């Protein structure tokens, strides 16, 4: 083996890192770079005075060598026995692998290394690295350690600009209109050259020109004690004699951690059980250790029921480790004063879930899952570790009438810390008075609960002001802070303009563009609950993403300062999916990456035409915290809508396009592009100089200077809250989808809203009114689901979703209302006659409201589907009807939700039922009236109508042939005759009928002709007389016949004789 002298700057950089407790970064370019890892590890081992540093080796799939130590030893023994191998022929890399504590990890399993500390990190397979992985792995390296990045052999480092990363496959979709541009890789490479603690070398340890900033590295003297360490030592000396606190603070590593522990002890000693202490910090600041020491202090103060919550008990290893360190400091003995209970669940890997203390009295430290918040009835102290990783509604449920400690990671790579700091802590701050460490106890909150906020800034794994940490925060914008508002005041929204951001310039690593990027990312981070470093890669490289910013009037005299960003918008182009892919999605369930809104709505509505439309999804919109609720967000949306509708045009657009075509032709002739990226010289890896691009275009473009894409709609997907829904609905967006399951982090349901664009240049693929049909179908499904998944919604949010403002598609709503009228068949199907009687009785306050509760679902659906049009129902009455009828809530639920008394709720509900009952009665009367047959009016054509032309209509006013009085008399006479006829036919009454008609009675009753006695004959007597007469006639005829027969017989006898 040929020995080669290593550049002294490499050894000096490693030794300086050990002396200052800072980390060092090395980039090795070449396929043999792994062979230099043992040399760097050897230099590090000689520089530190402790055991050999452990190594974390991360890779994608193939490690490139065997990591199996037993196989290596067998092969070595076999080669030695055959006499082939010798000590001189032993490979240094194999010796390094076999003698060093190395942990190998796939990039996909890098989450398992959280909480561990290593002395050296090796990263290979650069194409698989993402910003999340970069931050997650680098944070595990301790102070004085090394970070080694291995790159493959390349002729120029600028090949990284065009390298295809694995994550780029997620950015491409079927309808991508552009190619992926590796802007992040370029910015990453340029940042390495600027870092003073980084060296870029080839696989022979020759330092490349990109590290020209580190031409001369001077050796630094080891600092025995930093100012922070001196302050901590003096502080420990001061509290040494303090009971409990003195012993526990000895375990702290930084001054921030000691101050945080002291704040915890102050809250514990008060024993008010109405305080909340929040601890926020970046990763590696000692949050879990401070909580563990605080729990041991609570045990010393006599707290009996202590509960600890975390996403999983495995995350509490560090916390319980420092609980036991605190016990050791207070001279607690295991098995004598306390005992441990480990979990038998194999998923928890023997994690500690309970600690029983029985030194003075029985005390317990119990792990509890966030879902079991109902079991906290007897709690005195609840500790929530990594609260940002727990869904926000569960964290709220964990709060109660007891002392609460919670910690959360912010500005970290998990991307969940902002959810807690933005929402929960903000609510606690608003509901209570923040009590500082030096404040008086009399400064209590109105609600009887105090809030203390603690923040840890000083790292523990390495010393403060670590160059690698500063480089990583700048590269990934992890520590982006919001600039304070301008002292000149805020401009009126009408005076602001929306600008298009050129991403090539934004990520060019120029000083001005870097400052603008930090401002923009800080704006996004402060306004959204979930942020991760991968979002930065999406902003920079995704071909379908675009950025816009809203700026106030630009001062031309200000040539130094950057304009203040009032609002930032990130959008993504979606849609225009091929018909084959759509059919595969509908029939086979196939779904490509990207295109969130088209694929989601295709699955929900099974529509083949909508995914073929082109649209834009608003990924993020963030307003400056100092300028929120001033109209800037609405103004940005308004200008963005006008831009995509083609309302913002440029008169010189045609000329500009012709000029650009001419410039492209000239550039092609010259053989160079407009933006100079790669020089045409034959510079090698050892001689090339990497600098930012020159001749870059402007950072900001006016909307009139860029031609918009042809779009059919604009959409947004967000976590549903009442405030956000009102914001989007005010901008004329209609909801079309609401996810049934809530988000794991925020507990909010994802909502998709769309707005149709009126662009005359677009070819309409869907039928007219497609958005309104989606919205009506969504409302119908939402109404049916309010009693199930959406039952816990606040009635005001549900009412906002169902309430249509007049500005939203008034024509479509008006045309659809005629079809939504209640029909007679529907009414008979939904309500029986008994139902209507009960509703009538309740409206008249005769029965209780429980009698009509079963009618509420049907009545509510009719009202909210516009089949019962009642104009004078107020919003509060509609909310009560929705909550009781559709969400199946009780009156007790509405008392707290609407802040009304029970009698007020029932009174408003009764008024609503009265109005509904009146409307139903009117509907019923109308149905009866419509069911009656219509009489056709027939009038003869008399002389007075000779001038009339055409057929006589039913509505013509023609006089009848007979007046009403004569018609009534005829009718009465017919009725009397019918009654008489019925009486005459009745056998039981007919014998009592009096003889005589009207004329006979009038003659008999004449004055002066009335005799002293009157005999009245019955009709029955008359009938008897007539019967007798008829019988006599019959008997006479019979006798005559008999006589005639006798005479004939006599004559016959005589003739015979």
UniProtKB/Swiss-Prot annotation:
Pfam families: GNAT_acetyltr_2 (PF13718), NAT10_TcmA_helicase (PF05127), TmcA_N (PF08351), tRNA_bind_2 (PF13725). It catalyses: a cytidine in 18S rRNA + acetyl-CoA + ATP + H2O = an N(4)-acetylcytidine in 18S rRNA + ADP + phosphate + CoA + H(+); a cytidine in tRNA + acetyl-CoA + ATP + H2O = an N(4)-acetylcytidine in tRNA + ADP + phosphate + CoA + H(+). Belongs to the RNA cytidine acetyltransferase family. NAT10 subfamily. It is an enzyme of class 2 (transferase). Its EC number is 2.3.1.-. This is RNA cytidine acetyltransferase. Keywords: Acyltransferase, ATP-binding, Nucleotide-binding, Nucleus, rRNA processing, Transferase, tRNA processing. Part of the small subunit (SSU) processome, composed of more than 70 proteins and the RNA chaperone small nucleolar RNA (snoRNA) U3. It is found in: Nucleus, Nucleolus. It comes from the Eukaryota. Residues 654-665 have a biased composition (Acidic residues). GO terms for cellular component: nucleolus; small-subunit processome. Acetyl-CoA binds at residues 621-623, 628-634, 730. ATP binds at residues 284-293, 461. Residues 549-682 form the N-acetyltransferase domain. Residues 1038-1057 have a biased composition (Low complexity). Residues 1018-1033 have a biased composition (Basic and acidic residues). It comes from Dictyostelium discoideum (Social amoeba). The keyword DNA repair does not apply. RNA cytidine acetyltransferase with specificity toward both 18S rRNA and tRNAs. Catalyzes the formation of N(4)-acetylcytidine (ac4C) in 18S rRNA. Required for early nucleolar cleavages of precursor rRNA at sites A0, A1 and A2 during 18S rRNA synthesis. Catalyzes the formation of ac4C in serine and leucine tRNAs. Requires a tRNA-binding adapter protein for full tRNA acetyltransferase activity but not for 18S rRNA acetylation. Part of the small subunit (SSU) processome, first precursor of the small eukaryotic ribosomal subunit. Residues 654-675, 1001-1057 are annotated as: Disordered. The keyword Acyltransferase applies. Gene3D superfamilies: 3.40.50.11040, 3.40.630.30, P-loop containing nucleotide triphosphate hydrolases. The gene is nat10.
């Amino acid at each position: 083996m040929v020995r080669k002298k290593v550049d002294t700057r490499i050894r000096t950089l490693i030794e300086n890192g050990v002396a200052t407790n800072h980390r060092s970064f090395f980039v090795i370019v070449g396929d043999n770079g792994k062979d230099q890892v043992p040399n760097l590890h050897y230099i590090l081992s000689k520089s530190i005075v402790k055991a050999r540093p452990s190594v974390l080796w991360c890779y994608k799939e193939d490690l490139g060598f065997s990591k199996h130590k037993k196989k290596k030893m067998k092969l070595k023994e076999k080669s030695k026995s055959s006499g082939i191998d010798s000590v001189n022929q032993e490979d240094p890399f194999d010796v390094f692998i076999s003698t060093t504590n190395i942990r190998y990890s796939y990039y996909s399993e890098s989450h398992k290394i959280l909480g561990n500390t290593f002395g050296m990190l090796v990263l290979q397979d650069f194409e698989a690295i993402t910003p999340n992985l970069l931050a997650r792995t680098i944070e595990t390296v301790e102070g004085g350690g090394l970070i080694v990045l291995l790159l493959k052999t390349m002729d120029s480092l600028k090949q990284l600009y065009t390298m295809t990363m694995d994550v780029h496959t997620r950015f491409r979709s079927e309808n991508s209109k552009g190619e992926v541009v590796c802007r992040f890789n370029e910015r990453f490479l340029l940042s390495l050259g600027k870092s003073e603690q980084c060296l870029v070398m080839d696989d022979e340890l020759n330092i490349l020109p990109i590290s020209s900033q580190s031409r001369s590295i001077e050796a630094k003297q080891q600092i025995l004690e930093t100012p922070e360490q001196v302050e901590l030592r003096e502080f420990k000396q001061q509290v040494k004699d303090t009971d409990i606190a003195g012993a526990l603070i000895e375990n702290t590593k930084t001054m921030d951690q000691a101050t945080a522990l002291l704040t915890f002890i102050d809250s514990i000693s008060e024993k008010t059980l109405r305080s909340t202490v929040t601890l926020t910090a970046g990763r590696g600041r000692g949050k879990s250790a401070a909580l563990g020491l605080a729990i041991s202090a609570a045990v010393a103060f006599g707290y009996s029921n202590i509960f600890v919550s975390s996403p999983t008990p495995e995350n509490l290893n560090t916390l319980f480790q420092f609980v036991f360190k605190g016990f050791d400091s207070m001279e607690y003995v295991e098995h004598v004063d306390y005992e441990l209970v480990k979990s038998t669940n194999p998923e928890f890997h023997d994690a500690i879930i309970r600690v029983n203390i029985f030194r003075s009295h029985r005390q317990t430290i119990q792990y509890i899952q966030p879902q079991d918040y109902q079991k906290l009835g007897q709690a005195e102290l609840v500790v929530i570790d990594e609260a940002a990783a727990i869904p926000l509604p569960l964290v709220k449920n964990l709060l109660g009438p007891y002392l609460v400690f919670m910690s959360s990671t912010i500005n970290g790579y998990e991307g969940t810390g902002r959810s807690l700091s933005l929402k929960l802590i903000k609510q606690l701050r608003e509901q209570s008075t923040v009590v500082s460490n030096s404040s008086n106890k009399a400064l209590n909150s109105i609600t009887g609960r105090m809030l203390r906020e603690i923040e840890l800034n000083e790292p523990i794994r390495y010393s403060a002001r670590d160059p690698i940490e500063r480089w990583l925060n700048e590269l990934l914008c992890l520590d982006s802070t919001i600039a304070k508002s301008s002292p000149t005041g805020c401009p009126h929204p009408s005076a602001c303009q929306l600008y298009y951001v050129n991403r090539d310039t934004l990520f060019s690593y120029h000083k001005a563009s870097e400052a603008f990027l930090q401002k923009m990312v800080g704006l996004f981070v402060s306004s959204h609950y979930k942020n991760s470093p991968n979002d930065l890669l999406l902003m920079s490289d995704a071909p379908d993403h675009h950025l816009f910013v809203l700026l106030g009037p630009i001062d031309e005299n200000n040539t130094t300062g950057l304009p203040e960003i009032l609002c930032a918008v990130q959008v993504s182009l979606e849609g225009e999916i091929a018909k084959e892919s759509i059919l595969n999605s509908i029939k086979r369930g196939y779904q490509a990456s990207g295109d969130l809104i088209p694929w989601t709505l295709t699955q929900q509505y099974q529509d083949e035409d909508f995914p073929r439309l082109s649209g834009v999804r608003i990924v993020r919109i963030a307003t400056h915290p100092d300028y929120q609720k001033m109209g800037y967000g609405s103004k940005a949306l308004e200008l963005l809508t006008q831009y995509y509708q083609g309302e913002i045009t440029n008169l010189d657009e045609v000329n500009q396009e012709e000029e650009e075509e001419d410039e492209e032709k000239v550039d092609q002739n010259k053989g160079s592009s407009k933006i100079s990226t790669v020089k045409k010289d034959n510079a090698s890896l050892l001689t090339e100089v990497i600098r930012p691009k020159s001749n870059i275009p402007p950072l900001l473009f006016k909307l009139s200077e860029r031609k918009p894409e042809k779009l059919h709609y604009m959409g947004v997907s967000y976590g549903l809250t009442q405030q956000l829904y009102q914001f989007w609905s005010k901008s004329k967006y209609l909801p079309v989808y609401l996810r049934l399951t809530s988000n794991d982090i925020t507990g909010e349901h994802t909502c998709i809203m769309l707005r149709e664009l009126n662009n005359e240049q677009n070819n309409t693929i869907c039928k007219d009114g497609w958005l309104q049909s989606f919205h009506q179908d969504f409302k119908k499904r939402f109404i049916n689901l309010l009693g199930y998944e959406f039952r816990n919604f606040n009635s005001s949010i549900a009412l906002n979703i169902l309430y249509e403002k007049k500005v939203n598609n008034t024509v479509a709503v008006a045309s659809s209302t005629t079809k939504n009228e209640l029909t007679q068949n529907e009414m008979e199907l939904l309500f029986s006659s008994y139902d209507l009687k009960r509703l009538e009785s309740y409206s008249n306050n005769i029965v209780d409201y429980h009698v009509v509760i079963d009618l509420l679902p049907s009545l509510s659906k009719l009202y909210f589907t516009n089949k019962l049009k009642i104009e004078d129902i107020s919003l509060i009455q509609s909310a009560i009807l929705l909550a009781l009828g559709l969400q199946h809530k009780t009156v007790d639920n509405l008392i707290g939700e609407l802040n009304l008394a029970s009698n007020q709720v029932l009174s408003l509900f009764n008024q609503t039922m009265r109005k509904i009952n009146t409307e139903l009665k009117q509907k019923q009367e109308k149905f009866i009236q419509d069911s009656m047959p219509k009489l056709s009016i027939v009038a003869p054509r008399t002389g007075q109508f000779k001038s009339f032309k055409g057929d006589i209509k039913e509505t013509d006013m023609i006089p009848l042939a007979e007046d009403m009085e004569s018609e009534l008399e005829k009718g009465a006479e017919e009725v009397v005759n019918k009654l008489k006829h019925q009486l005459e036919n009745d056998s039981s009454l007919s014998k009592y009928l009096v003889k005589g008609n009207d004329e006979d009675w009038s003659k008999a009753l004449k004055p002066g002709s009335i005799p002293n006695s009157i005999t009245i004959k019955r009709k029955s007597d008359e009938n008897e007389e007539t019967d007798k007469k008829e019988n006599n006639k019959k008997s006479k005829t019979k006798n005559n016949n008999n006589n005639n027969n006798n005479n004939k017989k006599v004559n016959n006898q005589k003739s015979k004789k």
